[in-house]
Amino acid sequence: MPIGGVQSWTATVGRELQRLGHEVAFWGPERPLPAGRFDAGVVANVPHTRAALARCGRVLVVSHGIIPDEGPAGERVAYTSEGVRDRWKGAGPILRQPIDLAFWTQTDAPRRFLTRFSYRRGLDFLPALAKRMGLQFRHVADLPPLDARAALRESAVVLATGRAALEAMACGAPVVICDNRKYQGPLLDPDTLGAMARNYSGRGGVVPTPANVAEAVQRAMGAGSLRSHVEAHHDARAVTQQILEAMAC
């Protein structure tokens, strides 16, 4: 499963809906549409998923980003952050990124790594920065969830954005919001908790350099674990209930 993104969101919410007793069909535009009709549908990326809308009695569109594919459509729309909603000048509810806190957990494993948790490249100064700070460098780019979780549990600090940043927080790792994103280039958001309003994307931040990333890493390690932040704002159980309420189910 890719790091972060719609697939992880869908799997997390779908499992929670199943736990609550709902029958759930998972679908993506690369697959044939399931037969029959559905009481409700939760969809994103409407330019690619529009064919499914007519199969659903009611639809909630979740707008999760700033590019055209991720925009709002239809009558029931929710947004994953204030920044996303402002980008589209929308008025729907905010549904925070849902994280499975029963899976993404912390342990007492030694934390020896400065970890970059992203499928993206760039930020080539990070291995040298980790060495100067007495840490080993690890780039987690394509590990399955169990292996990614093990790596996060061994991380003294994690550089990530979006859902990946939240999964790292849930594993007890200090987090720096930093990545090299396709549409905005390299970004560092020094306000980790304030980044919630910006979907932890790095937007509105500064260009990362060895000096300001080192400062952000030291500050994050001083602040420590942010699991309590994820528990307060991103628990998949609470977010799924909010989804049902937004759909009037």
Regions found by a protein language model. Give the residues of each.
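Acidic donor-binding loop of glycosyltransferase active sites
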Residues: 150-166, 173-174
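Acidic anion/phosphate-binding donor-loop and adjacent secondary structure
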Residues: 69-72, 86-112
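Short amphipathic alpha-helix
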Residues: 6-17, 243
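Short hydrophobic signal-anchor/transmembrane segments that target glycosyltransferases
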Residues: 13-16, 20, 119-136
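A charged, aromatic-enriched C-terminal amphipathic alpha-helix characteristic of glycosyltransferases
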Residues: 5, 203-248
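Extended catalytic core of nucleotide-activated donor transferases of GT-like folds
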Residues: 14, 25-75, 79-83
